[in-house]
Amino acid sequence: PQCNEILDRIIAEKLDLTWSGYIRTSLITPDLARRMVQSGVGDLEVAITSGSQVVLNELHMGFRLDNLYDGCRYLKEAGFTGNLILNYSLNSPGDTETTLMESVASYKKIAAILGEDRVFPMLFFLGVQPHTGFEQRLIQEGYLSGGYNPLSLNPVAVKKMLYNPPPLSHLIARACLRAWDKTAWEQASPAGRSVHELYADESLFRGVVENAGRDVLINLEQDLLARGVGQSRNRP
């Protein structure tokens, strides 16, 4: 109700502004999408986390992918013209080669709805936070020792706090390194556009302007297909 009231006031007052937000498109209705567009919505950021419903359920994310896709369609139908940043947490608990392929497919599905030139996947790994269910799970599974120090500056300990275990970590790393090739980036950079003109740091610049996250996902898809992942679904 508060969200609708704010948007309605912006529309009623005819305020000429552009706003952005971190949202859950799974909660967007056709009416809300209309209000968002009429009130001046710009770019949006969405935590999709994974393209696998199984992984999302295991992480207790509390939404269904079908509803997220519907929200994107409602935005498109309402006339949304901004960019959509999709946050993925690769190699989450429960991820497999098959679910990674599902994440690639989810990006493609959203890009087909809104347009590839307006959908920007950003790739993250889950950070371990003390006194959380995630931390307790990792202790029970033996990934973390029961007496570990979350404030330790030991490089091995710090690395473990960013959850990206093998064997999927190696597959993801190869896809990232190919996408982050410095020479290819320099050749593709738009003429006259610098990092400092557009974004606070180089990572955001390359993530949005160069769409490096998309390149990582496409590389990952190619590697997974080469390993035979998902091929059975594509056979007639």
Predicted regions and their residues:
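C-terminal non-catalytic accessory extensions
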Residues: 200-236
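A structural motif corresponding to the C-terminal lobe/cap of the Radical SAM core domain
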Residues: 7-204
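Active-site-adjacent beta->alpha loops and helix N-cap segments on the catalytic face
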Residues: 3
